[in-house]
Amino acid sequence: MDLKYKLGNDVIRIVTGKNILKDFACELNSGGNISIISRNVYKKYDLSFIKNRIIIDDGERAKSMEYLTLIINELLNKRVERGDSIIYIGGGTTGDLSGFAASIYKRGMGLIAVPTTLLAQVDSSIGGKNGINYMNIKNLIGTFYNPKLIIDDISFIDDKKLMMDGLAESLKMGITIEPELFNIINNDPDYIIENIERIITLSINAKLSIVSKDFHDKKHLRYVLNFGHTIGHALESYFNNNISHGEAVANGMIIEAYISKCLGNADISNEIRSIIKRLGFKIIDFRSVDINRLLEYIKNDKKSESGYINIVAVNGIGRYKIEALSPEEMLKILGGMP
């Protein structure tokens, strides 16, 4: 796939394929361009053809003032100009930090994205959001800033656990926005792997269909992209981040589909549970969860407004609406979870 999309005021080129990164070696090494590379990715893959590089740690620790300052200092020391580009090669945290640095250095320089996880390829690299954490608050400081080029090299996707995290996000979009995506993922693992490039393309198109109408996230149209995340983020906090994002979102989708049913929508919670189980996600035994403590995390969700909790309620595949619940209503429904 080699297509161009308009997003906000920008035109973004997205190229998807296998073993394609070296095809862009000249562009990546052009002028004062500098690559910010995840340490894990740099250790695992031969990226010696990339000449001008900064290696950073993985994970939320890198999304900090410390690492931002390190990058800005390197850009200054290497006399990087505004017309040059930052290239990031890594997962979502590498992209968040690099995108923010590109957006503020000399009021904005070029940005090229090379997401190396399925999660980053189908989700975090699309939509322009970036940021760093501050005072233990996630993504407190950030901007909306698009890459001019996204290179989705599927040869990086060779870790089963990381692939599952990405499939959870693709399934989310298949349930709410793109039924064809749902139908592909609702298959055996071999079929899914054979169709991974198609999954990436459909996921990108699904997300772009939403963010292109609400680039700066002002109209609440992006709410649908949070299906499974209101509960999922709460589960991550509840378990002290000892479960992966994909596992949290997968379980969040099961629970939010159950909530949807309780609100009078079509019951697809068992269908979603079956797919998630087949994908290999661990399904949380909700009977062992302290509902009151979980509710406290749910109430902290950034999409909550005026004391009400906003949920993406699914009403069949490809159909959804936003429902607002009081904490008392949420507690009552969660208390009845099987």
From Swiss-Prot:
Family to which this protein belongs: Belongs to the sugar phosphate cyclases superfamily. Dehydroquinate synthase family.
Job description of the protein: Catalyzes the conversion of 3-deoxy-D-arabino-heptulosonate 7-phosphate (DAHP) to dehydroquinate (DHQ).
Compartment(s) where it occurs, according to its Swiss-Prot or TrEMBL record: Cytoplasm
Any single GO BP term: amino acid biosynthetic process
EC number of this enzyme: 4.2.3.4
Gene Ontology CC entries for this record: cytoplasm
Reactions performed catalytically: 7-phospho-2-dehydro-3-deoxy-D-arabino-heptonate = 3-dehydroquinate + phosphate
Primary gene name: aroB
The species this protein was found in: Picrophilus torridus (strain ATCC 700027 / DSM 9790 / JCM 10055 / NBRC 100828 / KAW 2/3)
Gene Ontology molecular functions: 3-dehydroquinate synthase activity; metal ion binding; nucleotide binding
Binding-site list for Zn(2+): 169, 229, 245
Protein name, per record: 3-dehydroquinate synthase
